[in-house]
Structure formats: structure tokens, C-alpha cells
């Protein structure tokens, strides 16, 4: 993020992965539930270096940052569960609450 702390980012992603597994398990047990994951912006302009290694091969990763601020990079939106198909495509952030509201009707 703003500190350009690649080690911290990796640790946060591990924590996020653990949390996401718990949430997906919950959705699987409660099929009326929708899980939506997104961000309001990207920060840091993170780039991962490429050295031509095979997929699955463990190699050191070289992360670089273009800024300590926000970027204009499009952020993903992931949806899982009841109504997830409504999140196919590209959305402006302000459109997402309307999609969720429509699903709640």
C-alpha cells in the first residue's frame, strides 16, 4: 500500500486468504448468501518482475512500486453465491451498491 512494504503486503494477503476461505465456507453452508469482494482503489502501482520461470516453480519475486499514492488501475470485483452472476463485467464503484440493492428486493 502507501508504505510500499512488499513483505507486509504478502502477510496481509495470507491473512486475507485465510479470511476468504472462512467466508466461502459460510456461503457454501448458506446458499442464500452473496459474498462480494472489491477495493475502492489500487495503491502503489505494484509490479511483479518476470524472469521466464515455469508456472508453479517457486522463485524469488521482485516487486516494484510506481508510487506511494493511489493509481488509476482498475480494481477487480469478485462475487460468489446467490446473485454472483450480476457482477459480471466492469463497474464503476458507485454502481455496486445499486446492484446489491437490486438483489435484496
Language-model-detected regions and their locations in the chain:
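A post-motif C-terminal structural segment
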Residues: 1-105
Amino acid at each position: 500500500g502507501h508504505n510500499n512494504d512488499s513483505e507486509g503486503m504478502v502477510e496481509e494477503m495470507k491473512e486475507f486468504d485465510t479470511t476468504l476461505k472462512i467466508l466461502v465456507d459460510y456461503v457454501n453452508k448458506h446458499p442464500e448468501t452473496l459474498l462480494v469482494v472489491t477495493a475502492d482503489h489500487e495503491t502503489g502501482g505494484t509490479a511483479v518482475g518476470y524472469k521466464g520461470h515455469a508456472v508453479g516453480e517457486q522463485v524469488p519475486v521482485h516487486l516494484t512500486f510506481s508510487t506511494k499514492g493511489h493509481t488509476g488501475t482498475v480494481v477487480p470485483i469478485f462475487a460468489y453465491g446467490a446473485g454472483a452472476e450480476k457482477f459480471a463485467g466492469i463497474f464503476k464503484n458507485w454502481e455496486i451498491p445499486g446492484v446489491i440493492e437490486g438483489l435484496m428486493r
